[in-house]
């Protein structure tokens, strides 16, 4: 069975999250309660013992499955499939028809599971750690752009331009600790697809980090740096674009994680309503 997480479940998150090997730190209880716990479901067996957890972000017909973790002694017993089936049932109940997640390509068992439930690989994403002095070496383009904070009126255009699920930006805006930035060409202010990032100064990192061209990364990074904490000599970001990944590798960016982004329809009976088709990217 699945149940919503409670403050007491931080111990399960803290025990299981490192097994995902993302390289990210375990959040302390207060930050976990503010950021991850609201979307976390705890999986229990028939005796009330915790066997794993899932962290979900549900957005207007789309679900981003952020974490899936199973207790080590319960792996290889079909528990992962049971957890995903239970998640799918919950999503169907709220008319959520699409889901996506990230998985390491070397985790062959997980990749097989996700393919078995209808997901396919859409692209590869690479998480980087980049010292700010290295970021200054990224090649710049000739296009004149400025950075600005994202206004709610800009959300739909940015989401459409970067094939993001509707509501993702509004969901990020609910967290006052996040900084939402976009790039604007003064000569073409209606062009919403130049650059967009959500920056977490406490992490510190940017995800999503989207640019129309790798040469637009420098001005977006410069805007992010204006919001960094004084004790932060580096930035972490996720590239979902081959040209940007190549540019970051060329200047010596450190790869922290490479993953497949997989997505598909939530399996099971058709929902009572039929939301519009969702973009491939979450």
Each model region followed by its residue ranges:
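Active-site rim helix/loop that mediates acceptor-substrate recognition in acyltransferases
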Residues: 10-11, 15-55, 159-182, 186
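Amide-forming acyltransferase catalytic core, primarily the GNAT-like/NAT-type
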Residues: 13, 117-202
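Conserved beta-strand in the GNAT
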Residues: 42, 48-57, 64-69, 190-201, ...
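A short, internal acetyl-CoA/4′-phosphopantetheine-binding micro-motif in the GNAT/acyltransferase core
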Residues: 44, 68-75, 203-217, 238
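Conserved beta-strand-loop-alpha-helix junction that forms the acyl-donor binding cleft
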Residues: 71, 101-110, 129-133, 235-245
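Conserved acetyl-CoA pyrophosphate-binding loop and the N-cap/start of the following alpha-helix
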Residues: 74, 78-86, 215-223
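Conserved GNAT acetyl-CoA-binding A-motif
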Residues: 91-102, 125, 229-239
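Conserved catalytic-core motifs of GNAT/GCN5-like acyltransferases
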Residues: 100-104, 115, 120-133, 254-265
């Amino acid at each position: 069975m699945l149940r919503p997480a409670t403050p007491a479940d931080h111990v399960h998150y803290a025990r299981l999250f490192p097994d995902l090997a993302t390289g990210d730190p375990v959040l302390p209880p207060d930050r976990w309660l503010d950021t991850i716990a609201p979307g976390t479901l705890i999986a229990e067996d028939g005796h009330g013992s915790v066997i794993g957890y899932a962290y979900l972000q549900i957005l207007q017909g789309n679900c981003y499955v952020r974490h899936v973790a199973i207790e080590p002694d319960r792996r290889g017993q079909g528990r992962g499939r049971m957890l995903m089936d239970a998640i799918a049932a919950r999503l169907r109940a709220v008319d959520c028809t699409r889901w996506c997640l990230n998985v390491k390509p070397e985790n062959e068992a997980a990749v097989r599971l996700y393919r078995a439930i209808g997901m396919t690989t859409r692209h590869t994403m690479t998480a980087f750690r980049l010292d700010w002095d290295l970021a200054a070496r990224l090649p710049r383009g000739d296009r004149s752009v400025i950075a600005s904070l994202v206004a709610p009126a800009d959300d739909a255009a940015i989401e459409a331009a970067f094939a993001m699920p509707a509501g993702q930006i509004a969901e990020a805006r609910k967290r006052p600790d996040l900084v939402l930035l976009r790039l604007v060409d003064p000569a073409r202010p209606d062009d919403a697809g130049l650059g967009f990032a959500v920056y977490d100064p406490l992490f510190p990192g940017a995800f999503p980090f989207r640019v129309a061209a790798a040469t637009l990364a420098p001005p977006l990074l410069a805007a992010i740096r204006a919001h960094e904490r004084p004790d932060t000599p580096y930035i972490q970001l996720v590239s979902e674009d081959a040209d940007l990944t190549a540019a970051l590798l060329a200047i010596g960016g450190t790869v922290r994680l490479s993953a497949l982004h997989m997505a598909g329809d939530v399996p099971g009976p058709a929902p009572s309503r039929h939301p519009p088709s969702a973009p491939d990217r979450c």
